[in-house]
């Protein structure tokens, strides 16, 4: 009796195995259908190995966006802090980013040289950074613009650029910070001429045509008593985001085995967080203070 049942179970298992193999073969055949050839049209956009991958985002039509949402001129601290919050969110979601730099309506994100994130596909780098940033901009808008409703969603375009060495990466970031200084100095003088001297935008533009850095500083100081060097670092230098170990103090209940009720005590823990700095990137001081950014690549 038992021998018969054992043989019966064995034959059922064998039949089941045959059916499963046939189903698997059918599944493979279905996956490799006649339509699969369309995959040959996909662009192979793998980034070169041993290069820093930089994704730079720029606000699309942000002059209009700033006008529609009543941004302060020449700088709106709310908008700049919102941009930084979005960039911090991107870094926290995509941990292969080692440093980011932002100014005005742009942000650059630097991925590790050794990053194999999404097989180093440029399209993945760009689209995920852009989508995370744009959605964060909408999500956190009310935290910074409490009395200003968002009239329409912002857009950001992106590009991916590869830098083969530490020096070229440092030069790229220096270039963006130099651009921040040039644009902010011009805008500071330009809007002072409009807001305080009553010039029209065209008149202010004509007044500044052909002027050098020293000329703009002289106009600010002699006509408006503004020392450009005293302007906030966030406006003049932009914002640098890096990973740093930060000590966090939290209050939690500590209970001994013999006690019914616990005692609340402050407990300190060290965590790695994204920290915003408004510092100089062009000199060597920053890189000496933060050698960990390039350390793994040396």
From Swiss-Prot:
It comes from the Eukaryota. It holds the Pfam family Thg1. Signal peptide: none annotated. Its EC number is 2.7.7.79. Keywords: Cytoplasm, GTP-binding, Magnesium, Metal-binding, Mitochondrion, Nucleotide-binding, Nucleotidyltransferase, Transferase, tRNA processing. GO terms for cellular component: mitochondrion; transferase complex. Mg(2+) 1 binds at residues 58-59, 105. Mg(2+) 2 binds at residues 58, 105. GO terms for biological process: mitochondrial fusion; protein homotetramerization; response to oxidative stress; stress-induced mitochondrial fusion; tRNA modification; tRNA processing. It is found in: Cytoplasm; Mitochondrion. Its cofactor is Mg(2+). InterPro entries: Thg1_C_dom (IPR025845), tRNAHis_GuaTrfase_cat (IPR024956), tRNAHis_GuaTrfase_Thg1 (IPR007537), tRNAHis_GuaTrfase_Thg1_sf (IPR038469). Gene3D superfamilies: 3.30.70.3000. Belongs to the tRNA(His) guanylyltransferase family. Homotetramer. Interacts with MFN1 and MFN2; functions as a guanyl-nucleotide exchange factor/GEF for MFN2 and also probably MFN1. Adds a GMP to the 5'-end of tRNA(His) after transcription and RNase P cleavage. This step is essential for proper recognition of the tRNA and for the fidelity of protein synthesis. Also functions as a guanyl-nucleotide exchange factor/GEF for the MFN1 and MFN2 mitofusins thereby regulating mitochondrial fusion. By regulating both mitochondrial dynamics and bioenergetic function, it contributes to cell survival following oxidative stress. This is Probable tRNA(His) guanylyltransferase. The lineage of its organism: Eukaryota, Metazoa, Chordata, Craniata, Vertebrata. The gene is Thg1l.
């Amino acid at each position: 009796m038992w021998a018969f049942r054992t043989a019966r179970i064995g034959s059922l298992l064998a039949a089941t195995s045959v059916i499963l193999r046939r189903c698997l073969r059918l599944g493979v055949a279905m996956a490799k259908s006649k339509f699969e050839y369309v995959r040959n049209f996909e662009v192979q956009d793998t980034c070169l190995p041993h290069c820093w991958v930089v994704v730079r985002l720029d606000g699309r039509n942000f002059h209009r966006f700033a006008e529609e949402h009543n941004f302060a001129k020449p700088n709106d601290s709310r908008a700049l802090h919102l941009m930084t919050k979005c960039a911090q969110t991107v870094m926290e979601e995509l941990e292969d980013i080692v440093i980011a730099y932002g100014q005005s309506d742009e942000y650059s994100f630097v991925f590790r040289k050794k990053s194999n994130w999404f097989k180093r596909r440029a399209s993945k780098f760009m689209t995920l950074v852009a989508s995370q940033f744009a959605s964060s901009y909408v999500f956190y808008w009310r935290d910074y613009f409490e009395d200003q409703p968002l009239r329409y969603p912002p857009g950001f375009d992106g590009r991916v650029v590869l830098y083969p060495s530490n020096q070229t990466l440092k030069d790229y970031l220096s270039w963006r910070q130099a651009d921040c200084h040039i644009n902010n100095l011009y805008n500071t003088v330009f809007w002072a001429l409009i807001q305080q001297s009553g010039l029209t935008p065209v008149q202010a533009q004509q007044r500044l045509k052909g002027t050098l850095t020293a000329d703009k500083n002289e106009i600010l100081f002699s006509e408006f008593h503004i020392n450009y060097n005293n302007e906030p670092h966030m406006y003049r230098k932009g914002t640098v985001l890096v990973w740093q170990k930060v000590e966090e103090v939290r209050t939690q209940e500590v209970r001994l085995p013999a006690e019914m009720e616990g005692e609340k005590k402050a407990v300190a823990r060290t965590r790695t967080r994204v920290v915003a700095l408004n510092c100089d990137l062009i000199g060597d001081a920053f890189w000496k203070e933060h050698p960990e950014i390039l350390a793994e690549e040396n």
